Amino acid sequence: MSDAADFIEVYHDAVDPALCRQLVERFEASGDGVPGKVGGGLYPELKDSLDLTISGRPEWADMEAALNQAVFAALLRYLRRYHYGLIAPIMLEISDPADGARKRLDADLLQRLDDQALGPIVQYVFRPGAINLQRYSAGRGGYPYWHCELYPRGADAEPLHRHLLWTLYLNDGFGAGETEFLYQRRKIEPRTGSLLLAPAAFTHTHRGNTPAQGDKYIATSWILFRRAEHIFGG
């Protein structure tokens, strides 16, 4: 993890490189990639990529499960550093494993929970988003438009439920192609198997730079809040 508290975390070796290669190979073999969209529209000057949403496709269920497992493990690590990513949005009460008493979840109590206790709480509040595989072609592809992940769209306002973004780098060695964060003045260099987590809001406005000597492959999605009716009932 980084030393500076900029809320951008990169977890190296989060996914085995062999699995990353399989994702790339299956993506290319599928022939199902389509031009990437921005906010529902096709604007190649803003985003030039070939995309494949694997969620909901039976033939990709194994890969989707493996990726969500890796992301969840990283999410627990992230919330152990940034406790209020979980406890600031929603007041939660749990049974303290030490004495069984009902207590409000605060930073001290969260830190005392092991993964077995913390995991179900996190799953109660958050859910995984649809996973998108993307290819950015050498010297041309990229997402040069400065953007964030949080915006109002659709009757269900699904994008407004996004809390964190994540990107898994599936290959490296192509030069450039960094994920660049505007306000943090930070560039994340792709490294096979590394998993990036960062907030979805405008504070972490970012862009994807063009790869130089080879195609860049990523898997990407979000950690979203569950719907209000799940968390609060009704």
Describe each PLM feature range:
Residues 1-195, 203-234:
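Fe(II)/2-oxoglutarate oxygenase catalytic core
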